[in-house]
Design a protein with these regions (language model features):
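N-terminal beta-strand motif that seeds the catalytic metal site of vicinal oxygen chelate
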Residues: 1-22, 28, 71-78, 119-124
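Short amphipathic alpha-helices in soluble, non-transmembrane regions
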Residues: 26-27, 86-91
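Intrinsically disordered, low-complexity, positively biased terminal segments
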Residues: 36-39, 69-71
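Short amphipathic beta-strand starts and helix->beta connectors
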Residues: 56-60
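Vicinal oxygen chelate
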Residues: 1-16, 34-35, 42, 44, 50-51, 62-83, 104-109, ...
Length: 124
């Protein structure tokens, strides 16, 4: 049962450098940086907020390895995998060599090393 008036409001990502990570997500999601401090940068998008939070001694996940596993990742719904991948890489994402389902999902890392997927498999 969906609880009325509860919606996804924000995603917070740990990182070593909040400013470039926030700039990446703002550009990729068509958002804008709305708040900045030394340890936190908030990006406002059309539907939600994404924030980059500075963490001392931050270490990115090593997925698909297990030394430091990912705790979560984003699946971004896109219309065209190739075009969306090219834009994400142009903005600073890195495409992983390991691609478990490249015809449906493209796995990338954001500038702080967080894995995320581009996919055409999420209905509108």
């Amino acid at each position: 049962m969906e609880v009325e008036n509860i919606r996804l409001g924000s995603l917070s990502l740990d990182c070593a450098e909040p400013t470039p990570l926030a700039a990446f997500w703002a550009a990729l999601l068509g958002g804008e940086v709305a708040f900045t401090s030394d340890n936190f940068v908030a990006v406002k998008t059309e539907r939600m907020w994404v924030s980059a939070v500075k963490v001392d001694d931050y270490r990115p996940p090593t997925w698909p390895g297990s030394d430091l596993p990912k705790q979560m990742h984003l699946d971004l719904a896109v219309d065209n995998l190739a075009e969306s991948e090219a834009e994400a890489v142009r903005l600073g994402a890195v495409k992983l060599e390991f691609q478990p389902a490249p015809d449906r999902y493209i796995v990338l890392l954001d500038p702080a090393g967080h894995p995320f997927c581009l996919t055409t498999q999420i209905p509108q």
